[in-house]
From Swiss-Prot:
CDD domains: RuvC (cd16962). Pfam families: RuvC. Belongs to the RuvC family. This is Crossover junction endodeoxyribonuclease RuvC. It is found in: Cytoplasm. It comes from Yersinia pestis. Mg(2+) 2 binds at residue 67. GO terms for molecular function: crossover junction DNA endonuclease activity; DNA binding; magnesium ion binding. HAMAP family: RuvC. Its EC number is 3.1.21.10. It catalyses: Endonucleolytic cleavage at a junction such as a reciprocal single-stranded crossover between two homologous DNA duplexes (Holliday junction). Its main location: cytoplasm. Mg(2+) 1 binds at residues 8, 139.
Length: 173
């Protein structure tokens, strides 16, 4: 059994989702958003760090999964996203959580079946996979999808002694 915290980072809204994995069964534990309503970037980063720390303390996850930075058309947006990711990652590392990173296309491919999925498709599949009564809000759904991706991909990882091997298309890499 493992508890996984997924994070969808953002400088204004950071989504989080927490699930429990027991074998192939996934159970929803919680989700939501950390909203930073101030304009001052250092204060936003402090709020993200504090929010993620609080979530980790509340749910006691075993694993921390976060979306990788993608290259946006606006370099300023990419830098702010990177800073938000950094604040969340530092919170996890300070509490000794192992950090895994996943590309947005990889998350969509894992959860929906296509890397070009729309946000509404991700929300629908997260609702279906976790048997939720309604679609979660978009940022929380993305965070839950990141946690689901971590669970799915960790099932395809074999640990042999100190070596780690990953199954890819039926082959060990």
């Amino acid at each position: 059994m493992a508890i996984v915290l997924g994070i969808d980072p953002g400088s204004r809204v950071t989504g989080y989702g927490v699930i429990r994995q027991q074998g192939r069964q996934l159970t929803y534990l919680g989700s939501g958003c950390i909203r930073t309503v101030v304009d001052d970037m250092p204060t936003r980063l402090k709020l993200i760090y504090a929010g993620v720390t609080e979530i980790i303390t509340q749910f006691q996850p075993d694993f921390f999964a976060i979306e990788q930075v993608f290259m946006a058309k606006n370099p300023d947006s990419a830098l702010k996203l990177g800073q938000a990711r950094g604040a969340a990652i530092v919170a996890a590392v300070n509490l000794n959580l192992p950090v895994s990173e996943y590309a947005a296309r990889q998350v969509k491919q894992t959860v929906v079946g296509t890397g070009a999925a729309e946000k509404s498709q991700v929300q629908h599949m997260v609702r279906s996979l976790l048997k939720l009564p309604a679609n979660p809000q978009a940022d929380a759904a993305d965070a839950l999808a990141i946690a689901i991706t971590h669970c799915h991909l960790s099932q395809n990882t074999l640990r042999l002694g100190n070596d780690q091997m990953t199954l890819s298309r039926g082959r060990i890499r």
